[in-house]
A protein has these predicted regions:
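C-terminal outer-membrane beta-barrel translocator/porin domains of Gram-negative envelope proteins
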Residues: 80-82, 140-155, 160-166, 171, ...
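Surface-exposed loop/interface segments of Gram-negative outer-membrane beta-barrel transport/assembly proteins
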Residues: 171-191, 200-202, 272-274
Length: 274
C-alpha cells in the first residue's frame, strides 16, 4: 500500500499489486509512505518515506541514552561524557551522536566538554559518511574525519585532526566468501601551542599513511595480511604483517604471526631547530 501524506496526515491510500520494477505516481507535491502498518515484514524501514518536493524532512528527536530506532524521526542520542587529563583535570560534557544498530550513510559523534582544571572548553568529535554499492566488488566507500582538542601542559593545548578514506572490496559473485580487502588512506595532523620559554623538540607534525589489509576470516582456517607505509617530514617506514590460525578437531588451535618493518628514513625533523 502507498500512502500519500499532507502535513503528515493521510489523504490518499492506494494498493499497488504486481510491481516488479518501478511505477510512476503522478504527484508534484506530496510525501509518500509505503508499508505503514508493516503488512510486509522488513528490517530497514527508515527509507519508507519520500518527499517529492524535497521540502519534507523527518523531525528531529532528542533521546537521552540510546534506544530502539524510530524510523519516523531523525534521532539524536545524548549521553553524559567525562574524561580525565593531568592538565585539564576532570572534563565533563555531553556526547551527541546518531549511531544505531542498523548502519546509516552519515554518522556523527560530538563530545564537547568543559575542563575543570584548565577552565577551558575541550573535547573530541568525528563524522563518517558511508557509501554502499551492493552490485559491485567495491561494496563500501567510507569517508571520515576525526579530531580532538585537549591540554598537553599548563595553559598549552594541542589539536589533532585526522581525515581518512577507506575502500572495501569483496567478491560480489559469491557473497558466501569471507575474503575482504581494505585500502585505507589516512593522514594525522597535530598542532600545538608553543611555550615561549621552552625549546620545542617535538614541533607540529603531519603523518601520511597508506595501508592495505587482506583477510579471509573463517572458523577453521584464518588468514590475514597487512601492508603499511608511513611518510612524514621526520621519517618514512614500511611494514608488513601476516597471520595464520588453524583450528583442529580437538578444539586446539595454532596461531602463527609474522611482522617485519623497515625505516627508509629516520632522522631529526629539519623544523626541530626552528
Amino acid at each position: 500500500a502507498t500512502f500519500r501524506l499532507n502535513n503528515m496526515i493521510e489523504i490518499i491510500q492506494n494498493w499497488n499489486d504486481y510491481i516488479l520494477d518501478s511505477k510512476y505516481l503522478p504527484q508534484r507535491s506530496a510525501t509518500f509512505l509505503i508499508n505503514e502498518n508493516n503488512e510486509v515484514p522488513e528490517i530497514n524501514v527508515r527509507n519508507n518515506y519520500k518527499g517529492i518536493d524535497q521540502a519534507y524532512r523527518k523531525p528531529i528527536q532528542l533521546r537521552l541514552i540510546q534506544d530502539i530506532e524510530d524510523p519516523n524521526y531523525r534521532q539524536i542520542f545524548i549521553l553524559p561524557a567525562a574524561s580525565y587529563n593531568l592538565y585539564d583535570g576532570l572534563s565533563l560534557g555531553l556526547r551527541w551522536y546518531n549511531r544505531t544498530i542498523l548502519p546509516k550513510p552519515l554518522h556523527f559523534n560530538l563530545e564537547p566538554q568543559y575542563a575543570l582544571n584548565s577552565q577551558s572548553p575541550v573535547g573530541r568529535g568525528s563524522v563518517i559518511y558511508n557509501r554502499w554499492n551492493e552490485t559491485s566488488n567495491l561494496f563500501l566507500q567510507r569517508f571520515g574525519i576525526a579530531g580532538n582538542y585537549f591540554s598537553y601542559d599548563q595553559g598549552l593545548f594541542y589539536r589533532r585532526l585526522s581525515p581518512y578514506t577507506i575502500f572495501a572490496f569483496r567478491d560480489n559473485s559469491n557473497l558466501r566468501k569471507n575474503k575482504r580487502q581494505y585500502l585505507t588512506l589516512r593522514s594525522v595532523h597535530v598542532t600545538r601551542d608553543k611555550a615561549l620559554a621552552q625549546v620545542d623538540r617535538e614541533p607540529n607534525y603531519s603523518v601520511y599513511n597508506l595501508q592495505f589489509n587482506y583477510s579471509d576470516n573463517n572458523l577453521i582456517n584464518f588468514y590475514s595480511a597487512a601492508f603499511n607505509a608511513q611518510l612524514s617530514s621526520a621519517f618514512s617506514k614500511v611494514s608488513a604483517q601476516f597471520e595464520y590460525r588453524k583450528l583442529f578437531l580437538n578444539n586446539r588451535q595454532i596461531n602463527l604471526r609474522f611482522y617485519a618493518g623497515l625505516f627508509l628514513r629516520n632522522g631529526p625533523n629539519p623544523m626541530s631547530s626552528v
